[in-house]
Amino acid sequence: MRILSIEPLSKAAFAPFGEVIETEGSDYFMINGGSTRRYHALAEVQTSAPEDRAIVSIFVARALPMPLTIRMLERHPLGSQAFVPLRGNPFLIVVAPPGDAPRPEQVRVFLGNGRQGVNYQRGVWHHPVLALLDDDEFLVIDRSGAGPNCDEHFFGEDEQLLLHRP
């Protein structure tokens, strides 16, 4: 079983999978009479049909026991999905490039620092949210609309991956 290495989350490293949502290193402009910096369009919400809409939700996640065997990844073929931590806690991001099925050798793991969110592009394979603390909260922005928008891929026993706590 391959043990996954954890990388720090950066815009450059995560670019094949979507956008990192963060203010550090991002452009802004002043609004509200100069009292507020607006970091504009840090990520793009993707939908696939005119009747689709972007929605905002909150997920409350529990920490999964570590080490964690990665048995499954999911993707959303009809829209992007963004996760922004609300409590400032680090979290893990497990991803693989879009395609018919994720390949174990292409799976990567990133550690968000608690001040960064991620926006998975449509079709990017990813593990469900991986909080490191119980009852951690995430703002989630994704697509709502007709049609199935969650495909799951289960790895064969010889393809499963192991993730240790950072």
UniProtKB/Swiss-Prot annotation:
InterPro entries: RmlC_Cupin_sf, UAH_cupin, Ureidogly_lyase, Ureidogly_lyase_bac, Ureidoglycolate_lyase_dom_sf. GO terms for biological process: allantoin catabolic process; purine nucleobase catabolic process. It catalyses: (S)-ureidoglycolate = urea + glyoxylate. Its cofactor is Ni(2+). Coiled coil: none annotated. Signal peptide: none annotated. Gene3D superfamilies: Ureidoglycolate hydrolase (2.60.120.480). GO terms for molecular function: ureidoglycolate hydrolase activity; ureidoglycolate lyase activity. CDD domains: cupin_UAH (cd20298). Pathway: Nitrogen metabolism; (S)-allantoin degradation. Keywords: Lyase, Purine metabolism. Its EC number is 4.3.2.3. It is an enzyme of class 4 (lyase). Belongs to the ureidoglycolate lyase family. Homodimer. Catalyzes the catabolism of the allantoin degradation intermediate (S)-ureidoglycolate, generating urea and glyoxylate. Involved in the utilization of allantoin as nitrogen source. This is Ureidoglycolate lyase.
